[in-house]
Amino acid sequence: MCSIGEDDFGDEGGTHAMLPSCSETGIVLRAGDCSKCGQSSQQLYKLNFRSAECSECFLKYVRHKFRAALGAAKVLPRNAEILLVIDGSSESLVLLDMVHFAQTQNTFKRLHCNARVLYVDAHCSPIKEEESPLLALNELQRRYEPFEFYVIQLNGDPQSLQLLKDYTVRQLDSILDQFNSSTSRQDYMQQKRKFLVGGVAMKLKCSHVFEPSISPSLATQLLTSVALGRGASVALDVALLDDRLMGDVKLLRPLKDLNDQEVQFYVHAKELKAFRVDDPSHYPLSGGSLQSLTRDFVANLQLNYASTVSTVFRTGDKIAPKRNSKEIMASYCALCQSLLDNNISDTLLAIEYSRAVSEVGVELKMKSSCDVLEQRVLERLNEKEELCHACRNIQAELSSGTLI
């Protein structure tokens, strides 16, 4: 452990301790010369650890990070069929714009792939027509021709996929309101969305899926996954390539090296307008969810310590379970597609025993309490064998119905 400054916390309050960064960055609203190309610009962009630059130089820099993520790993074959998932967030619009730009370049610089766009409708309450995502989606389709846009509801199946021009907004009849906690609801929405996207990709014969995750969201995802009991799959949750989708579909995160500042600057430079209406924070009591609290925790640290997000999410590359040849016949979770660990640990036994005590409660009789508890623990461990520990926790928070 680092011990710098440990002995310096006296009356001066830690004079030699690490201090938060306070560098001034942001869009400079004045004319000036770009530090890269030397051209005069009406608006300069100042990123952390970079000199002020014009919009053209800034866009080249950010787009290079996108292309470098795909090129360095060589994970996207030539002329691949890709499914680009958008949710109306700023980062999803940035990804859409980058893919479209990469496909409109000359032959040498062109990204050789065929892209389709998917929007997953997860809003489960009536909304005003002017607040409907269809207006923004239709505008995007006109702007980013010739991409085909598809829409599907979160509670649907891949066969219910519709083209944007044929889609009509209707109230969702889902189980989102049946969860006892907002943490489980958000976790279910995330896993269900990924499961649905994999099915849609198979239907459209797409071999790869582009997900608009950036470094802050991946850092939050890493910490959240560990807290929710998904530690065995946390490396895939934050990696560039996630191969857990059905049908050998590969999920890619080409924006994983971008941060919030770069995304917001890109949105400003390209005059993009976010329209996300299915954010989990719109649901009641979502502010107290584990995901929301973790996101706020990471964001607050990032404000003062610029390397927080990078340090956290890059740790995920080093966290992976041991693999062996027996995994050829391994089974996978029916919802999140993660590898099932059939070895019962003492921790899981203790958790299920505690839940059994809570469920049986005062109905226990002293003479049969041990037998009843042991029987209940065995029943719980054998229930939902097709689900992993984290997804069984989601099922336990569901007041009625089943996840699959």
From Swiss-Prot:
GO cellular component term, pick one: cytosol
Which GO terms of type biological process are on file? Answer: protein urmylation; tRNA thio-modification; tRNA wobble position uridine thiolation; tRNA wobble uridine modification
Function comment: Plays a central role in 2-thiolation of mcm(5)S(2)U at tRNA wobble positions of tRNA(Lys), tRNA(Glu) and tRNA(Gln). May act by forming a heterodimer with NCS6/CTU1 that ligates sulfur from thiocarboxylated URM1 onto the uridine of tRNAs at wobble position.
* InterPro entries assigned to the protein according to its UniProt record, in alphabetical order: CTU2, Rossmann-like_a/b/a_fold
Q: Keyword set for this entry?
A: Cytoplasm, tRNA processing
What is its pathway?
tRNA modification; 5-methoxycarbonylmethyl-2-thiouridine-tRNA biosynthesis
Q: Which Pfam families match?
A: CTU2 (PF10288)
The family classification in the record reads:
Belongs to the CTU2/NCS2 family.
Q: This chain belongs to which protein, by name?
A: Cytoplasmic tRNA 2-thiolation protein 2
Question: Which GO terms of the molecular function aspect are on file?
Answer: nucleotidyltransferase activity; sulfurtransferase activity; tRNA binding
> Is the keyword Nucleotide-binding assigned to this protein?
no
PANTHER family in alphabetical order: CYTOPLASMIC TRNA 2-THIOLATION PROTEIN 2
Q: Does the keyword Cytoplasm apply?
A: yes
In which broad location class does this protein mainly occur, judging by the first location in its UniProt entry? cytoplasm
Localization: Cytoplasm
